[in-house]
Amino acid sequence: MKKNIFVLLLFFFIANAVMAQQKWVNVDTAFQPLPNNFHVFKCTDNLDGKPFIAYYAEAKLKDQQLDFTADTVKDRRITPLKFYERNNQPLLLVNCTFFSYATNRSLNVVIKEGKLVAFNTHTIPMRGKDTFQYKHPLGSAIGISKKRRADVAWLFADSSLKRAIAFERKPYLLQDSFYLVSKFDFVPELHHFPKREKRRGINDNWKMKTAVGGGPVLLQNGAIKITNNEELKFAGKAIEDKHPRTCMGYTNDGRLIVMVIQGRFSGIAEGATLTQEAQLLKDLGCVEALNLDGGGSSCMLINGKETIKPSDKEGERPVPAVFLIKKAPNP
């Protein structure tokens, strides 16, 4: 009898876990023409009892007919639609980096054709009794190599470097009384022992063809582990606030997942917390993933057509950088 009860309880919990996952519907027909290894899905199920709308695109990384790249503009911002026109109408276009309204510059790394074209911000002034102190976080990014392998890492990437330094296992957070910071502040031994540091998961030559930054990291080794405090992205309990979201991740079988979540439409689409966002990506099989700039910036175009409705009343918010998937030119 006890064994039967245990089996019934186990079945109940498994059934509930399966039912808790969101139902995604293929909506390729709404965004044609699409190549074979690229698909679009939509979800309108309630999320934890609240109205929810989201889309994700799935692309096979090894497909030579797909080109994964990025674009950025200097000291200004333009709408995703303008980026779409500027880039010869790519298959997919999505916002990515956080940015400064004062300078219009990205606050996160962008790598285009193997070159750093935007950089992380590694110094944050403290306030109150710590006015003369500074915190120095690393920034997270998702990259795709020439061999079409994806990776999520925390990076030191300022304008003094040709290549970003990747911290694969954990983020570092420094605090001192100096505004300026260098790679040797994070890894003093890097200059003399680069091979040893690589064994510790620190790579001073992160060779990515394309990368875009954001944060915080949401998934590590297939588990939800949100490094918000280490990356200093959202203050206090903001990790559980619901907002529009943009995020990216990848699976062990070589699929890139690009997701946008609609929000700030009461009773229609109320957004997601970082924890909910991480769970959605985990349920889709992602092993590593990170959050990108969200809120009014969240926007994904498929063949130039909007997926979610942007939350800004003016429509698409101008941004300084985007991630793109293009149809590769015929050889």
Regions found by a protein language model. Give the residues of each.
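Conserved, well-ordered active-site substructure
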Residues: 103-130, 229-287, 297-331
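Short glycine-rich loop/turn motifs
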Residues: 52-56, 139, 213-215, 243-247, ...
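Zymogen propeptides
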Residues: 21-164
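Short, glycine-/Ser/Thr-/acidic-enriched flexible segments
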Residues: 62-64, 99, 149, 157, ...
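Active-site-adjacent helix-turn-beta-strand microarchitecture at beta-sheet edges
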Residues: 104-237
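Bacterial Sec-dependent N-terminal signal peptides
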Residues: 1-23
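A short catalytic or substrate-binding loop motif that flags glycine-/basic-rich loops and adjacent residues
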Residues: 47-51, 133-136, 209-210, 238-242, ...
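Structural recognition of the beta-strand scaffold that forms the well-ordered cores
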Residues: 91-95, 142-143, 151-152, 216-218, ...
